[in-house]
């Protein structure tokens, strides 16, 4: 999926497109942009993701998010090259998602009247900042790093700011957080 990513306006009536290297967060008409891919991922990736559950010493295979890096390859890198992953992908030694593996919750399933093997929960509190926001923020800071951003700005009352600040600091990028008056979590 190399050379596959681009930005596209989420408004179907607009549909403006931009290169992935763009720093735009909105299209020229003021609508939000989303990362899109020209091609669908090959079905053989399921096997690759399954095999990566046994990390084989790669921090990017341990990571909850970068284990699926082919689906998030907006950096357009060789996803099997540890050197390229280390250079471009933001990671705290694979800690994001490492401990937050899903657990089978048989007592909760019984309480809900569901099949005891059908309910799995993933404790996101094990992420480095203690927040579920780490999964998305690691990709946001990777994109910021890719486009050469000097600063990340977010509005948050808690989880987003903790995650943004932590990953930005790890990459040497300034981070400004704006909190609405009287809205601290």
Where are these regions (language model features)?
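PLP-dependent amino-acid enzyme catalytic core
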Residues: 1-185
